[in-house]
């Protein structure tokens, strides 16, 4: 069928590509695949689905090494070498809900195909992403809700009352939405 699409993919005319030719998992990769199911081109979703499943072993090592958590995680950058660790800048690199967001694509494919054998195949991947957050969620001291922490709202920063600019937060709205969907689907 082909390969999953990254920001510059095959169309780059240089050896060193912008964004390192990686897969940005904070909307870019996902958005490239949104039309697949709704346009009745489900087979175009398959490379992303296979790539997602291939991230699990590396993501399990990252979950254990960085968070001492079960399951699997991937951050904002991905590539063909199964890179799942945090990126180098906290404003975007600390985003740890990318595996959960990728699992939305696994479930969307099932919703359009209703293929139960396929769902049995991808469910362990979805469950592993959910297990990571079962271990990672913490109680917000003010609201008492379970939230992701540490996390970011990708590529956003916050100005603190003292004027300092920070990127790391707890319970970003994006995380809340992605995790609600992941937990609903698993």
Predicted segment positions?
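Extended, well-ordered alpha-helical scaffold segments
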Residues: 1, 44-55, 118-133, 182
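Short, small-residue-biased leader/transition segments that mark boundaries at the very start
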Residues: 2-7
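The feature captures the catalytic groove of carbohydrate-active enzymes
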Residues: 9, 14-22, 70-119, 134-186
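Carboxylate/His-rich catalytic cores and anion/metal-binding grooves
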Residues: 25-72
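Hydrophobic (often cysteine-bearing) scaffold residues that line and stabilize catalytic clefts
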Residues: 28, 41, 45, 98, ...
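Short amphipathic alpha-helical face segments that pack within enzyme cores
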Residues: 31, 101-105, 128
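Structured segments of extracytoplasmic/periplasmic soluble domains
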Residues: 35, 51-58, 109-112, 129-132, ...
